[in-house]
Swiss-Prot record:
<feature type="binding site" description="in other chain">
    <location>
        <position position="53"/>
    </location>
    <ligand>
        <name>ATP</name>
    </ligand>
</feature>
<keyword id="KW-0460">Magnesium</keyword>
<dbReference type="GO" id="GO:0005524">
    <property type="term" value="F:ATP binding"/>
</dbReference>
<dbReference type="InterPro" id="IPR036676">
    <property type="entry name" value="PurM-like_C_sf"/>
</dbReference>
<keyword id="KW-0712">Selenocysteine</keyword>
<keyword id="KW-0418">Kinase</keyword>
<feature type="binding site">
    <location>
        <position position="105"/>
    </location>
    <ligand>
        <name>Mg(2+)</name>
    </ligand>
</feature>
<feature type="binding site" description="in other chain">
    <location>
        <position position="146"/>
    </location>
    <ligand>
        <name>ATP</name>
    </ligand>
</feature>
<dbReference type="InterPro" id="IPR016188">
    <property type="entry name" value="PurM-like_N"/>
</dbReference>
<keyword id="KW-0808">Transferase</keyword>
<keyword id="KW-0547">Nucleotide-binding</keyword>
<feature type="binding site" description="in other chain">
    <location>
        <position position="123"/>
    </location>
    <ligand>
        <name>ATP</name>
    </ligand>
</feature>
<dbReference type="GO" id="GO:0046872">
    <property type="term" value="F:metal ion binding"/>
</dbReference>
<dbReference type="InterPro" id="IPR036921">
    <property type="entry name" value="PurM-like_N_sf"/>
</dbReference>
<keyword id="KW-0711">Selenium</keyword>
<dbReference type="Pfam" id="PF02769">
    <property type="entry name" value="AIRS_C"/>
</dbReference>
<protein>
    <recommendedName>
        <fullName>Selenide, water dikinase 3</fullName>
        <ecNumber>2.7.9.3</ecNumber>
    </recommendedName>
</protein>
Length: 447
C-alpha cells in the first residue's frame, strides 16, 4: 500500500538524531528495496498504537464476566479495576501470596511451590511509525513496561504476537516483517530476555505485540497499592506521542496540515516525531530498578487511556484513602500548541490523549523523589544509542508532576496545570507558565 508522496522523517535519525539510535541502525528507505517511494507502514491499519484501546467504562463491563466467583469478603488480593491490559485470564490457583488479577497492568499468580509468583502480561497494537524496525522495538518496550511498572527488572521469557496484513504484496511482506521481528527481538535482548515463540496469523491489519513472563520472589516486585498522603507523583517520559505521530502524517494531508502550520514548522514536526519514536522505544527498566532503591509505593505505565485514565485506575487500587492531584504536564515541545490548534482533538491538556509505550507514573516518598529524578538523568541503562562509540547525551529525564493527598481514591488534573515544554534532544529545558502562577505549589517543583 502506498501514497503519492514518500514518508517523511524516517531517514536514519536525520537532523542530528542518528547518534541516539542503536548502533548500526538504518531507517527503511523504501526505494532502495524496490518498494514504492510512498510506502507507509501505517497505511496497513486504520488505528495507531495504544490508541486502539477499548474505552475504560466499556472495558470495565466486559471484564466483569471474567471475574472468578468468590464468597463475599474473601481475600483475593488487590481488587480489580480497569487497567491498561486484561493481563492473564486464567484461573488463579489456591496458592497463598499476593495476587493481582484481571484489569491490572500485569497478573500476579502465586505458584504452588517455593513461595514464588508468576507475573505475566500481554499487549499488542497497530503500527504508528513508518519504520518497521523501530515499530518492533516500540512494541516490545510496551509489553515489558507492564512488568517494569511493578518494579520488576528481569523477564524470563517473551512470546511474539504478529499478524501479517493480507493487503501486503510479497515484496513488502518479505522486507517489512523480518525488520519488525528483529526490532522486537533486539529490544527483548536489551531487556535481558529472549523471544522463544509466539503466534503469526493473516489479518487485514498489521498487528505486533507479545507476552512477557517472569517467576518472582515477593521482594522482586512492588504491589501497586501502597501510596500514602504526602507522596509525590513522578513521570518518567513526556506526554504527546500520539500528537507527534499524527502531526507527522499530517505533513502530507493539506487540509490537516493547514490547521497546525501556524504553530509549528515542518522541521519541528520531524523533530517531534523522532523524539516520540525514541521515547517510545526506550525501556522503562531504569525506572523499575530505581523504584526499589527509592522506596516507591505504587506505579503504573501510561498508555492507551492517557495519564489521567491510568492515574485514576492506580488511585482506585490503593489501600489507603488517597487522591492523586496532577499539577505539571511534561509534553514534547510544540505538541500542546498542536493539540490546541487542532481543536483539542487529542485531549492532551486534559490528560486523555493516548500514549504508546509511555513512561511510568510512580508514587514516591517526597524526600526521595528528587534523588530518583537525578539518578534517572545520570543513568544510561536502557537508553537507545547508549552502546554506540561516542554516544552522547544523559539518561532519561523524569519530572515531579503532582502530589498524593488524603481523598477518596480518585485522580484529577488541576484547572490550569503547568505545561513543561520538553525540548527535542540537545536543547535546553524550558517551562511555560500557565496564567495561574500558583498552579504548582512550592513542594511540587521540578526535580
Amino acid at each position: 500500500m502506498s501514497g503519492s508522496e514518500p514518508p517523511s522523517g524516517d531517514s536514519g535519525g536525520a537532523g542530528g538524531y542518528a547518534v541516539f539510535y542503536p548502533a548500526g541502525y538504518q531507517a527503511l528507505n523504501p526505494e532502495e528495496h524496490g518498494l514504492d517511494r510512498g510506502f507507509r507502514l501505517t497505511a496497513f491499519s486504520d488505528m495507531k498504537g495504544u490508541g486502539c484501546k477499548v474505552p475504560q467504562e466499556t472495558l470495565l463491563k466486559l471484564l466483569q464476566g471474567l471475574e472468578p466467583d468468590r464468597p463475599p469478603g474473601e481475600d483475593g488480593g488487590l481488587g480489580t479495576g480497569v487497567g491498561d491490559e486484561t493481563a492473564d485470564f486464567g484461573l488463579v490457583s489456591a496458592a497463598q501470596g499476593p495476587r493481582l488479577g484481571i484489569g491490572m497492568d500485569s497478573c500476579v499468580i502465586p505458584l504452588r511451590h517455593g513461595g514464588l509468583s508468576l507475573v505475566q502480561t500481554t499487549d499488542f497494537f497497530y503500527p504508528l511509525v513508518e519504520d518497521p524496525y523501530m515499530m518492533g522495538r516500540i512494541a516490545c518496550a510496551n509489553v515489558l513496561s507492564d512488568l517494569y511498572a511493578m518494579g520488576i527488572t528481569e523477564c524470563d521469557n517473551m512470546l511474539m504476537l504478529l499478524s501479517v496484513s493480507q493487503k501486503m504484496n510479497e515484496k513488502e511482506r518479505d522486507l517489512v516483517l523480518p525488520l519488525m521481528m528483529k526490532g522486537f527481538r533486539d529490544a527483548a535482548e536489551e531487556g535481558g530476555t529472549s523471544v522463544t515463540g509466539g503466534q503469526t496469523v493473516i489479518n487485514p491489519w498489521i498487528i505486533i505485540g507479545g507476552v512477557a513472563s517472569v517467576v518472582c520472589q515477593p521482594n522482586d516486585f512492588i504491589l501497586p497499592d501502597g501510596a500514602v498522603p504526602g507522596d509525590v507523583l513522578v513521570l518518567t517520559k513526556p506526554l504527546g506521542t500520539q500528537v507527534a505521530v499524527n502531526a507527522h502524517q499530517w505533513l502530507d494531508i493539506p487540509e490537516k496540515w493547514n490547521k497546525i502550520k501556524l504553530v509549528i514548522s515542518r522541521e519541528e514536526v520531524e523533530q517531534a516525531y523522532q523524539e516520540a519514536m525514541l521515547n517510545m522505544a526506550t525501556l522503562n527498566r531504569t525506572a523499575a530498578a530505581l523504584m526499589h532503591k527509592f522506596n516507591a509505593h505504587a506505579a503504573t505505565d501510561i498508555t492507551g487511556f492517557g495519564i489521567i485514565g491510568h492515574a485514576r485506575n492506580l488511585a482506585k487500587q490503593q489501600k489507603n484513602d488517597v487522591a492523586f492531584v496532577i499539577h505539571n504536564l511534561p509534553i514534547i515541545s510544540k505538541m500542546a500548541a498542536i493539540s490546541k490548534a487542532g481543536g483539542n482533538l487529542f485531549g492532551l491538556l486534559q490528560g486523555t490523549s493516548s500514549e504508546t509505550s509511555g513512561g511510568l507514573l510512580i508514587c514516591l516518598p517526597r524526600e526521595q523523589a528528587a534523588r530518583f529524578c537525578a539518578e534517572m538523568k545520570s543513568s544510561r541503562m536502557g537508553l537507545l544509542g547508549a552502546g554506540q562509540d561516542g554516544g552522547v547525551g544523559d539518561g532519561q529525564q523524569a519530572w515531579i508532576i503532582g502530589i498524593v493527598e488524603k481523598g477518596n481514591r480518585c485522580a484529577r488534573i488541576i484547572d490550569k496545570p503547568r505545561i513543561i515544554e520538553v525540548p527535542y534532544r540537545g536543547s535546553v529545558v524550558s517551562v511555560q507558565e500557565g496564567s495561574n502562577n500558583n498552579a504548582s505549589p512550592p513542594e511540587v517543583q521540578l526535580a
